[in-house]
Design a protein with these regions (language model features):
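Often metal-dependent polyanion-binding catalytic scaffolds in large enzymes
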Residues: 1-416
Length: 416
C-alpha cells in the first residue's frame, strides 16, 4: 500500500486538491452509510490498487489484482462499483469548474504579472493587445463585429438525466457558498450537512435514462441548460470582455454589444425523424417561450423590488404620473405581461386551453424598449452605476436569448 496519496498529489492546485479530497470523503461516507462497510471496503481496495497501478506502470501485478477482484463480483456489485467511480469523476469535474471560477475571481481582483492558463477569453485578448502590429482600435472594431452562433442539439448518446444535471448545479452553488464561508465554522457545518444530503440523494437517484426521449423532452433538456447555466453565464462573459477593453483602452464595449446567439435543433430536426411533426414543433416553440417568460418575469420582479428610487426622467413621469416609486410603477406592466404570457402558454400546453395572441409578449423589443427608457433615466440622474448592474445584465440577456431563448432551426431533409 502506498504511504502517500499520489492521486491527489497529481492534481495541479492545492485548492482543487482540497475540493476533490473533500468531495471524495463525502462520497465515501455516503457509500458507507447507504451500502455498508463491506462495499465501502471494496471501493477503497479497488481505488488503492488503481493508484498503485498508475504509480507502477512497469509492473503488471496491481492491474492483475484489480482484474481478479472484479471477476469475483456479482453483476449488481459490479454495477454499484461502476457507479461509485462514475460519481467520483463527476464530482472531480464539478470541483474543476469551481476551481476555474475561483481562478477567474483571482484574475479579476488581483493585479499581477504572472500569466494565467485556461482563462481563455482574457488570454486571447491580452495577447492581441500585446501585439504592437495590431492597432487597439482595430481590436476594438473586431470585437464589436463578433458574431457567434451556438447551436444546442440532443446527442443520441447523451444519457445523463436532467434531474442529475440540476443536482450537480445545486451542489456547485453550495460548494461556492462554502468557499466564501471558510472562516465561519458554524455555517460550514450547516453547508457540510447540505452537501452530504445532496450527495446521498444523488447516490440514490437512477442516473440513466431508461427510455428514448421525445422531441419535447429533448427540448426541455436544452432549456434546462439555458436556465441552469447559460442564463447567468452570458452577462458574466460580457462583463469580462468589457473589463479587458476598459483595462487596455480606457473604454468599454458598446452597451448594445451582443455577439452571441443561440439556436436549437431540438424539436425542429425532421430529417429521418417522423415524430417531429408540425404540432410537435409548435409545442416546442411555445415551451421555449413559456420558459423565457418565466425567466424574464423572475428577473423583472428582482429589478422592481430593488428599484425604490424616486428621482427619474420626465419621460417616465409622463407615463406613471406623480409617485414616490416611479421605476416600480413603470416596470410593472412589463412584468405583468410576462406573467400573462407564461400563464397563457402554460394553459395551452397542459390543458389545450386556447389563448389570444394579444395576451402574449410577441417580440424582444417589447422587453428592451422600457428597459432602455429606465437606463436613460438612471444615467440622467447620476445613477450610471445602477444602470450598469442588474439592468444591463437583463438587457444583454434579452438581446442574446430573445423571447424564445434559442432560435429553432428547421431541417426538413439533410441533402437540402
Amino acid at each position: 500500500m502506498l504511504k502517500r496519496d499520489l492521486y491527489y498529489e497529481r492534481i495541479p492546485t492545492k485548492s482543487l486538491r482540497d475540493d476533490v479530497r473533500y468531495l471524495g470523503n463525502i462520497l465515501g461516507r455516503v457509500i458507507k452509510n447507504q451500502e455498508g462497510q463491506k462495499f465501502f471496503d471494496l471501493v477503497e481496495k479497488i481505488r488503492l490498487l488503481s493508484k498503485a497501478n498508475i504509480a507502477n506502470k512497469n509492473h503488471k501485478e496491481p492491474f492483475k489484482k484489480i482484474l481478479n477482484e472484479i471477476k469475483k463480483l456479482s453483476p449488481n456489485s459490479l454495477f454499484k462499483l461502476t457507479r461509485a467511480f462514475n460519481h467520483f469523476m463527476n464530482f472531480y469535474n464539478l470541483a474543476e469548474s469551481i476551481d476555474a471560477s475561483r481562478t477567474l475571481d483571482f484574475y479579476e481582483n488581483v493585479k499581477y504579472k504572472k500569466k494565467l492558463k485556461n482563462i481563455f477569453i482574457e488570454e486571447i485578448f491580452e495577447n492581441f493587445f500585446k501585439n504592437k502590429k495590431i492597432p487597439n482600435n482595430k481590436i476594438y472594431n473586431i470585437a464589436k463585429s463578433l458574431n457567434i452562433g451556438i447551436v444546442l442539439t440532443a446527442h443520441p448518446t447523451e444519457v445523463k438525466r436532467r434531474t442529475l444535471i440540476q443536482k450537480y448545479h445545486s451542489l456547485t452553488e453550495i460548494l461556492e457558498q462554502r468557499n466564501l464561508l471558510k472562516n465561519y465554522p458554524s455555517k460550514l457545518k450547516i453547508l457540510d450537512r447540505k452537501i452530504f444530503d445532496e450527495v446521498t440523494i444523488i447516490w440514490n437517484t437512477d442516473e440513466i435514462k431508461r427510455s428514448k426521449p421525445t422531441p419535447a423532452e429533448e427540448a426541455r433538456w436544452g432549456l434546462a441548460i439555458i436556465e441552469d447555466s447559460l442564463w447567468d453565464t452570458i452577462p458574466k462573459v460580457y462583463r469580462r470582455l468589457n473589463q479587458i477593453f476598459e483595462k487596455n483602452m480606457g473604454k468599454g464595449l458598446p452597451k448594445n454589444f451582443n455577439p452571441i446567439e443561440f439556436g436549437s435543433w431540438m424539436g425542429g430536426d425532421r430529417d429521418g425523424n417522423p415524430f417531429v411533426t408540425a404540432e410537435v414543433t409548435k409545442r416546442v416553440i411555445l415551451l421555449s417561450r413559456w420558459e423565457a417568460a418565466k425567466l424574464y418575469e423572475k428577473s423583472m420582479t428582482k429589478l422592481i423590488r430593488s428599484y425604490s428610487m424616486e428621482k427619474c426622467s420626465k419621460k417616465i413621469l409622463k407615463t406613471t404620473g406623480k409617485t414616490f416609486e416611479p421605476y416600480r410603477v413603470y416596470l410593472r406592466p412589463l412584468r405583468d405581461k410576462l406573467r400573462k404570457t407564461h400563464r397563457a402558454i402554460e394553459g395551452y400546453l397542459t390543458n389545450n386551453k386556447s389563448f389570444n395572441d394579444k395576451d402574449l409578449l410577441l417580440e424582444r423589443e417589447e422587453i428592451l424598449k422600457p428597459l432602455r427608457v429606465v437606463r436613460e433615466s438612471l444615467e440622467q440622474n447620476q445613477s450610471e452605476n445602477i444602470a450598469s448592474g442588474d439592468l444591463l445584465d437583463l438587457m444583454r440577456r434579452a438581446k442574446c436569448f430573445g423571447i424564445n431563448l434559442a432560435r429553432l432551426d428547421i431541417r426538413q431533409e439533410s441533402s437540402r
